[in-house]
């Protein structure tokens, strides 16, 4: 029985979950909320590093901005992808206007940009809006 570390999307506590329990709707040991809600996690400067480095599952981050038309168009597709991919993959969003330092750190030049992280390391990136099927296909091809 292997154990996975999963960061809570609500309180950001790290939870140890047996891998066979992932599909059984596990809850956070600290705040008691569901670890997987079927929605992308909103990241901030204080929670970003915790999620990309402490989760044992891959984390896909959508770097976006409120003024970006393609970002707004892709948001529902990204949310649909979260429903399909959880709990094997965590989908998250980072507002580049509010977190300019992180956007600069990862050299985000166009938005939306998706980056797949595993163990804090970037595995792949894709710029431009995509459909839910394209997002799922792209993620599955890299994890």
Where is each model-derived feature located?
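Non-catalytic, surface beta->alpha helical segment in thiol-disulfide oxidoreductase systems
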Residues: 110, 115-143
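A short beta-strand-turn-helix
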Residues: 14, 41-59
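Cys/His-rich microdomains that often coordinate metals
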Residues: 15, 35, 75
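Short Cys/His-rich micro-motifs in 6-15 aa windows
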Residues: 31-40
């Amino acid at each position: 029985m292997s154990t996975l570390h999963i960061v809570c999307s609500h309180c950001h506590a790290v939870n140890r979950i047996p891998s066979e329990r992932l599909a059984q709707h596990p809850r956070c040991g600290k705040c008691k909320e569901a670890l997987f809600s079927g929605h992308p996690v909103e990241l901030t400067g204080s929670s970003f590093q915790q999620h990309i480095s402490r989760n044992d599952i891959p984390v896909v981050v959508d770097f976006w901005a409120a003024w970006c038309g393609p970002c707004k168009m892709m948001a529902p597709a990204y949310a649909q992808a979260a429903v399909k991919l959880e709990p094997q993959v965590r989908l998250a969003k980072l507002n580049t206007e509010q977190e300019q330092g992180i956007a600069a750190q990862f050299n985000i030049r166009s938005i939306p940009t998706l980056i797949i992280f595993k163990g804090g390391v970037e595995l792949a990136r894709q710029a431009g809006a995509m459909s839910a099927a394209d997002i799922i296909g792209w993620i599955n091809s890299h994890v």
